[in-house]
Amino acid sequence: VIETINIKALANSITDEQFEQLCAQNRDTKFELTSQGELIVMSPTGSESGRQNGDLFGQIWYWNRQTQLGIVFDSSTGFTLPNDAKRSPDVSWIIKSRWDELSIKQKRKFAPIAPDFVIELLSPNDRLSDVQSKMTEYQACGVKLGWLIYPDEKRVEIYRLGKETEVLLELKNLSGEDLMPKLTVDLQEIF
């Protein structure tokens, strides 16, 4: 089993510029940086996880293409959260007016903004506690709606800003609720 590697030796010693250089020089590797300065090296997902992630991204992208309410990002996109962590959700979405407030320079880097919506897809390489902690961090940083999807268990944890986490089993679809009107994500290809 390939696992995510946390490199604690760099805690509080890597600058934003160094992190950006590291990512640019290692485009085939996905990195995140915790708010404590811990560098996380993430292994690529397997083909099935990649397919599932692509399906989720495609459904969000298609809905957004029709509604034009925001901007959709895939898992290669990094954001600098308000707590200074640099995170890359599997799928994310930002309300257009919030994205438009950022400068071109900010948009070209790890944009200093928490997405309004995130999806994390639990892959065999992930530690559940790490991904749940990341979802809690997203909430604390202002993410309004988040889905943690466990394909093997046909389970979804829904994280809503200011509310308790809701756990749902055997769903056929998920709703974007008030945040993303008329969004319905079909989970049958994921489960």
Residue ranges and their predicted role:
Residues 1-191:
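Gly/Pro/Ser/Thr-rich low-complexity, intrinsically disordered segments predominantly at protein N-termini
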